[in-house]
Each structure stands twice: as C-alpha cells, then as structure tokens.
Amino acid sequence: RTMNQETFQIFLWVMSAVALVVFIALYFVKAGYGMFRTASWGISINNKLAWVLMEAPVFIVMFGLWGKSGAGFAVPVYFFFLLFQLHYLQRAFIFPFLLKGKSRMPVAIMAMGIVFNLLNGMMQAGGLFYFAPEGLYADGWAYLLKPHALLGIILFFAGMFVNLHSDYVIRHLRRPGDTKHYLPGKGLYRYVTSANYFGELVEWTGFAILTASPAAWVFVWWTFANLVPRADAIHRRYREEFGDEAVGKRKRIIPFLY
C-alpha cells in the first residue's frame, strides 16, 4: 500500500483531468472498435478474446485488493463490491461470448481499455476499501436503507437492465451470416440511438449515489467522457446511413436531452 489519502486524492484529480482530455479528443477521433474499426488502427484480434482480455483485469484487481484490504464481508462495503463485480462478471465473462459474427478489435484499443480498467480497479477499490471517509459506512445494514442508497440501488439495477436489454436488441438485429447494419428500434432505442450506453451511464451513476464515493463519481465522469462522444459519432453514422427520417427525433444517449 504505497498510497496515502493525499496521494489518492491527487490520483482522482489526475484521472478526472485525463477524462476531460479523452472527452474532447473523442469528438475528433473515433475510437476504432465496432462500426468505426479501420485498418489505420493496426493489428487486431478476435473481438470476443479482446473483450475478455480488456474487461477481466478490473474484475481481478478489484477481487485482489478487496482480499488484501481486510474489508471482509462487512456490509455495506461488501454489497458495493458484489454489485461492481456482478457488472464485470457479465461484461468480461458472459457478454463477449454472446457477441455474434467474426468482428475484430484493434490491439491498441484493447490495450487502452486494459490500462483504464487496471487504474479504475485501483480507484474503486481505493475509494471503497482503503480511503473511504471515516465513519461513512459505519451504519452497516442500516446504510442500505437510507434514501440515497435505495435510489442508488434502483438506478444501478435499472441501468443494468437497460444495458443488458439493449445489448440483446442489438445482437438480434441480424440473422446469422448477415453483416449489414440496422437501426435498432426496440426498448429505449425508440428514444436514443445508443440505449446501451445510456443504461451503462445510469448504472454507474446509481453506483456513485449508493456508495457516496468520490472515486465512483470519477468513474461516472469517465463513463460519460468515453460514451457520450461515441454516442454522437454513432448518431451521425446512423443519419448518414439510414437518413434523417429513419432516425427521426431520437436523441444520442440521454432521452429527450442529448
């Protein structure tokens, strides 16, 4: 444990500043995975394998740091840990194997994802197990019944549901062997072109409200900085590909707003 409270605060500020740079940059450079993959991103590997290698590190780091911290099974922190791990269990070990088709991911994108996930694992574990404000979680089970905690839990699971349902909708747009793009129109896709990203944003916002952890809010900001510009790029691509009429009044990521 080479960090102290002060170093951890600096770490959070640096991560927040880098997220701002990423947010601005992604409006100019489209991250080359999915529909935006081009040869210029260099060597690529199988998409399923890439997702596992990219998302598994945060699951492993979080588990390791939880074990090392001695936080044990004390509620509410253990409950936060389980929610976080539930998301990444799905994202690293289930989601990749549900992906259809033979698409590939540039190794450069995967490497950036791995670096972020390692840092985020340290950030979230630090915020929950090592540097949580004194006495914040002292109420045990009673903490989970506080209004903000209940709101956070509801948002977390609502966001997770939207995220999973939206991924399901996207997977079932194509018949086997088909490689064309289609405009998704079910569920929250009636309101936004990137409903899966909206779900993820709501999920982590719920987590941050629930845990009241500054580190979790930095992660919300990172999620926003990463997904909002991409949702904008997808929205533009859909308008080019399917026309303004087909896209209609749908927003990019936040229903009715953006």
Please give the residue ranges for each predicted region.
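Juxtamembrane interfacial secondary-structure elements that flank transmembrane helices
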Residues: I24-R37, L89-F93, K102, G127-P133, ...
